C-alpha cells in the first residue's frame, strides 16, 4: 500500500491554548503515529514531553481540522524528524489512555491514534524538541511502552 502525499501543503489551523485545554479535558484526541521501519528494526524517540515522557515511543501528533490522516502523518514526519516518509500500510486505530497531560491542571489524555507503518525517504533526520534521542530497536522487542508493543504486534 505504498502511498505518496496527496494533499501536500494544505493549510491547517492550530487551536488557541484556552480552547485546547477545554478539548483535552473533555474530548478524545484524533492522532496519527508513525511506526518507522528502519535498518532492520523500528525507529523510536526518547520522549521529553507528556504524555509518555521518559519512554521510547513512536513519533506522532494530533490531526488538525480539515487535515486528512495521511496529510497529518506527512506533517508530523516533517515537524518531528525533518524528513519525508512513504506509507507502507495502515496498522489500524488504537485507543490510548494516559494518566498525564501536557496541559496544566488536566491530569489525563485520551487518544484515538491511527498508526501507519512507514519508511524514511531520507536518512538525514532532524529531531524536534519532543525527543532527546532517536534509536533503532531490533527484534526481539522487550521493555517498551505497552502502546508501542501493540503497534509492533500489529506489524506481524
Swiss-Prot record:
Keyword DNA-binding belongs to the record: no
Matching SUPFAM superfamilies: Nudix
Keyword annotations from UniProtKB, A to Z: Hydrolase, Magnesium, Metal-binding
Annotated motif Nudix box, positions: 61-82
One GO biological process term: S-layer organization
Pfam family membership, one: NUDIX
PROSITE patterns: NUDIX (PS51462)
Domain Nudix hydrolase: 25-156
GO molecular function: hydrolase activity; metal ion binding
EC numbers on record: 3.6.1.-
TM helices/strands, residue ranges: none
The protein's annotated pathway: Protein modification; protein glycosylation; Cell surface structure biogenesis; S-layer biogenesis
Domain of life of the native organism: Archaea
Family matches, as InterPro entries: NUDIX_hydrolase-like_dom_sf, NUDIX_hydrolase_dom
Disruption phenotype: Impaired formation of the tetrasaccharide present at 'Asn-532' of S-layer glycoprotein Csg. No effect on 'Asn-47' and 'Asn-117' glycosylation of S-layer glycoprotein Csg.
CDD domains per record: NUDIX_GDPMH_NudD
Requisite cofactors: Mg(2+)
Binding site for Mg(2+): 60, 80, 130
Cofactor-binding details, from the entry: Binds 1 Mg(2+) ion per subunit.
Enzyme class: hydrolase
UniProt-annotated binding residues for substrate: 14-15, 47
Family, similarity comment: Belongs to the Nudix hydrolase family.
Record PANTHER family: GDP-MANNOSE MANNOSYL HYDROLASE (PTHR43046:SF12)
Function, in words: Nudix hydrolase involved in N-glycan biosynthetic pathway that takes place under low-salt conditions (1.75 M instead of 3.4 M). Participates in the formation of the tetrasaccharide present at 'Asn-532' of S-layer glycoprotein Csg, consisting of a sulfated hexose, 2 hexoses and rhamnose. Mediates attachment of sugar 3 in the tetrasaccharide.
Name of this chain's protein: Low-salt glycan biosynthesis protein Agl8
Originating organism: Haloferax volcanii (strain ATCC 29605 / DSM 3757 / JCM 8879 / NBRC 14742 / NCIMB 2012 / VKM B-1768 / DS2) (Halobacterium volcanii)
Gene name of the encoded protein: agl8
Amino acid at each position: 500500500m505504498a502511498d505518496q502525499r496527496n494533499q501536500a501543503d494544505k493549510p491547517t489551523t492550530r487551536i488557541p491554548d484556552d480552547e485546547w485545554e477545554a478539548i483535552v479535558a473533555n474530548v478524545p484526541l484524533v492522532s496519527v503515529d508513525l511506526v518507522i521501519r528502519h535498518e532492520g528494526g523500528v525507529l523510536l524517540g526518547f520522549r521529553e514531553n507528556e504524555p509518555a515522557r521518559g519512554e521510547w515511543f513512536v513519533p506522532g501528533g494530533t490531526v488538525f481540522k480539515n487535515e486528512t490522516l495521511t496529510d497529518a502523518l506527512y506533517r508530523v514526519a516533517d515537524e518531528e524528524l525533518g524528513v519525508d516518509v512513504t506509507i507502507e500500510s495502515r496498522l489500524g486505530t488504537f485507543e490510548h489512555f494516559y494518566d498525564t497531560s501536557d496541559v496544566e491542571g488536566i491530569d489525563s489524555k485520551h487518544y484515538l491514534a491511527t498508526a501507519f507503518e512507514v519508511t524514511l525517504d531520507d536518512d538525514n533526520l532532524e529531531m524536534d524538541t519532543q525527543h532527546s534521542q532517536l534509536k533503532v530497536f531490533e527484534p526481539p522487542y522487550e521493555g517498551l511502552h505497552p502502546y508501542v508493543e501493540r503497534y509492533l504486534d500489529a506489524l506481524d
